[in-house]
C-alpha cells in the first residue's frame, strides 16, 4: 500500500511539473527556464499596433476582464508585442522571463498562433495568471498548418 501511495504522489507531482510544457501542436523549440511570470490584476502592454485583432484575442482568451495599461516603451511593459521580419511567415517566438514576456512574430498570423500557445501555457488562479519561464519558437514545418 505504501508503494502505491508513493507511486501515485510521484506521478501527480510529475504531471504538475510538466503542466506548462503541454502545448498542441508542439512548437518547434521549447527551452524551459527557472521561475514564473505572474500577472496580477493590472497588466501593462507595449505593441507597435495597439488596434491589432490578436491583442483582443489575447485579452479574450488569456486575460479577460483585466484592465490593460498601454506603455510607449518596451522596457516598462509586462508584455511586449514586437514584429520580427527575420522569423518565417506565421512564425513566432515567445520569451517569458520573471519580469516580462516578449512575443515576436513575423506577421499577424504568427501573433495569432502565439496567442493560442499562450492560452495553453497559462495557469490561472484567483486574481492572477502564471506563465512558466521559457523560450518558445515555432513556425510552420510545411506550407500550411495542420494537426
Map each language-model feature to its residues.
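Bacterial Sec-dependent N-terminal signal peptides
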Residues: 1-23
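Acidic, contiguous N-terminal accessory segments
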Residues: 17-142
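Hydrophobic faces of well-ordered beta-strands that scaffold small-molecule active sites
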Residues: 145-147
Amino acid at each position: 500500500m505504501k508503494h502505491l501511495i508513493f507511486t501515485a504522489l510521484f506521478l501527480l507531482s510529475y504531471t504538475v511539473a510538466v503542466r506548462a510544457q503541454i502545448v498542441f501542436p508542439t512548437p518547434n523549440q521549447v527551452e524551459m527556464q527557472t521561475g514564473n511570470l505572474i500577472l496580477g490584476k493590472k497588466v501593462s502592454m507595449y505593441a507597435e499596433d495597439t488596434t491589432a485583432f490578436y491583442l483582443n484575442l489575447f485579452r479574450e482568451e488569456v486575460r479577460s476582464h483585466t484592465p490593460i495599461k498601454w506603455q510607449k516603451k518596451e522596457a516598462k511593459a509586462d508584455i511586449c508585442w514586437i514584429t520580427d521580419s527575420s522569423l518565417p511567415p506565421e512564425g513566432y517566438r515567445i520569451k517569458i522571463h520573471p519580469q516580462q514576456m516578449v512575443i515576436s512574430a513575423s506577421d499577424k498570423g504568427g501573433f495569432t498562433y502565439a496567442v493560442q500557445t499562450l492560452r495553453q501555457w497559462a495557469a490561472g488562479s484567483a486574481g492572477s495568471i502564471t506563465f512558466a519561464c521559457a523560450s518558445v519558437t515555432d513556425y510552420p514545418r510545411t506550407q500550411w498548418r495542420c494537426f
